[in-house]
């Protein structure tokens, strides 16, 4: 699961509905997790480090296809809050979810 930050994660600006505990749960369930944002890679890594979450990738939005090249998975998902997020996700072959839509798909008990 690739996460946008702003408007998606609770630590974003603006904050989104995906909590860091939900990200941890996804990782515990075996998902490959990371972020794809217009924030710098250094800033993305600092966010994850601050919250003690080890991610497998941090990329800029236009580099999402590199994640697909790097990891062999049965499905590729990106959670973001804008049309731009959706455009980059679909261009890279990822299924796109808005944050509130992702709740029922990845965290059904969180609704």
Where are these regions (language model features)?
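Conserved Lys-Pro-Asp/Glu-containing loop-to-beta segment of HAD-superfamily phosphomonoesterases
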Residues: 60-84
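Short secondary-structure boundary/hinge segments and terminal tails
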Residues: 44, 66, 106-108
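Acidic, Mg2+-coordinating phosphoryl-transfer loop and its flanking beta/alpha structural elements
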Residues: 77-111
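Output/docking surface of receiver
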Residues: 56-63, 97-103
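Short hydrophobic beta-strand segments
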Residues: 1-2, 78
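Short loop/turn motifs at secondary-structure junctions
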Residues: 54, 72-75, 93
């Amino acid at each position: 699961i690739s996460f946008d930050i702003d408007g998606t994660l609770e630590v974003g600006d603006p904050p989104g509905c995906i909590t860091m505990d939900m990200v941890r749960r996804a990782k515990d369930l075996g998902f490959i997790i990371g972020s794809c944002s217009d924030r710098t890679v250094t800033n993305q890594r600092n966010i994850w480090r601050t919250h003690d979450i080890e991610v497998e990738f941090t990329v800029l939005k236009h580099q999402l296809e590199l994640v697909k090249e790097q990891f062999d998975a049965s499905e590729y998902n990106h959670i973001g809050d804008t049309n731009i997020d959706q455009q980059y996700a679909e261009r890279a072959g990822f299924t796109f979810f808005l944050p509130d839509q992702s709740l029922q798909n990845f965290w059904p008990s969180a609704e």
